[in-house]
Amino acid sequence: LACNGVQITGWLPLVQPDGLLRWRPSLLSVAQGMQLWLEHLVYCASGGNGERRLFLRKDGEWRFPPLAAEQALHYLSQLIEGYREGMSAPLLVLPESGGAWLKTCYDAQNDAMLDDDSTLQKARTKFLQAYEGNMMVRGEGDDIWYQRLWRQLTPETMEAIVEPSERVLL
């Protein structure tokens, strides 16, 4: 598949006649959701016209509707641009921390980002919970590669993470 000057090669397993079907015996992380979206874009850009379905434990379900090949290539092209940016400088997309921020600020009904003080404070709290983790769950801040980029998480660093996360994950 050629997109934005890049030849994409690989396997897209378990393609059904009516689209892609996946299942996971767990809850879905933001990184896994991003992988599903990427597979869906490749499927649609390659001429597939079915939907993308994912079934999760506890009656969870995700569905991506079919996209026209041109629209899928457009979205894929944006992700490739992000990849290229990340090849020349660190692209600070932390899927779980940035995703926690976005889940709090994004209003799906109105397709808008909320930026009132109350929502932003909740988003900061959710971001820090995902970044720092707790006794049961390791936070993204424990990653040694992130620790090499910054010693302490400052408000400026948090902003530098939120902006590309919004662009890439939303």
How would you describe each model-predicted region?
Residues L1-L170:
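Structural signature of nuclease core domains in nucleic-acid processing machines
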